[in-house]
């Protein structure tokens, strides 16, 4: 994951503390991130018997402006950020999603705290930059690291502090992952399939069919084993579901295995 490799890169005596503001703290702790950084929940409770809440509530009811109320959700956590702190936005492709306004709001809150902001390891569809609010937001970053040339070329025109750098995940240290002994010395190919990709298919079942053709080609034309490797394990998008379908179809070959969910260093 991007946050794992980033925290590992920043594990340096120069920094007093590395703080990860997370919407999924339990998941991050499960994968061991609490061992390399401090984890804080992004949204915190707040009192409704305050003037800021009353103002925010009025703005919602009279102007349909939900931003002031949203700010209250994040205020306690973002108040932990101080002047000249370096804040990395690590979502990668956050600006490509429907809730982009939330990230613009959070960025502005960080700037108001006096932080230096970095858009870290990002990918942005150039079409998204037709939105003037996004353009204005992107211009405010002190540094942008784009992880591929399409994003770099688009953002460089807007913010000169844009550089082209490989995704931080490529710098992630690898850890040994246990697999059945018969696979250890085999030449292997790793394959991932995501429900997120399947949801975008134009012809029902075409993605799975293409993966089946790929696996059958590998089994027929090579002596390679195949490792089915999950990447995203969310309630609404679990890679293990389509991967298990592939495994059940080809397990009798004796050359296919499913890698269980584990921390990203082992998956790598």
Task: Describe these PLM feature segments.
Residues 1-268:
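Active-site anion-handling motifs in enzyme catalytic cores
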């Amino acid at each position: 994951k991007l946050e794992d490799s980033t925290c590992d890169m920043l594990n340096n005596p120069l920094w007093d503390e590395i703080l990860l503001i997370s919407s999924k703290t339990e998941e991050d702790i499960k994968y061991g991130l609490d061992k390399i950084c401090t984890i804080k929940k992004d949204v915190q409770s707040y009192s409704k018997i305050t003037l800021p809440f009353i103002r925010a509530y009025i703005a919602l009811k009279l102007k349909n402006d939900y931003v002031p109320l949203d700010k209250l959700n994040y205020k306690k956590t973002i108040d932990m950020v101080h002047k000249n702190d370096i804040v990395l936005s690590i979502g990668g492709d956050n600006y490509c999603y429907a809730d982009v306004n939330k990230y613009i709001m959070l960025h502005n809150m960080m700037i108001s705290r006096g932080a230096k902001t970095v858009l870290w390891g990002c990918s942005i569809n150039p079409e998204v930059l037709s939105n003037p609010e996004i353009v204005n937001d992107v211009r405010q970053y002190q540094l942008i690291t784009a992880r591929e040339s399409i994003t770099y070329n688009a953002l460089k025109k807007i913010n000169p502090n844009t550089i082209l750098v490989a995704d931080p995940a490529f710098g992630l240290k690898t850890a040994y992952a246990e697999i059945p002994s018969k696979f250890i010395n085999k030449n292997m190919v790793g394959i991932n399939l995501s429900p997120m990709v399947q949801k975008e298919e134009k012809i029902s079942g075409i993605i799975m069919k293409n993966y089946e053709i790929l696996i059958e080609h590998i089994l027929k034309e090579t002596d390679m084993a195949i490792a089915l490797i999950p990447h995203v394990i969310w309630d609404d998008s679990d890679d293990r579901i389509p991967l298990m379908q592939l495994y059940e179809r080809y397990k009798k070959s004796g050359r296919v295995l499913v890698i269980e969910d584990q921390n990203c260093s082992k998956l790598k």
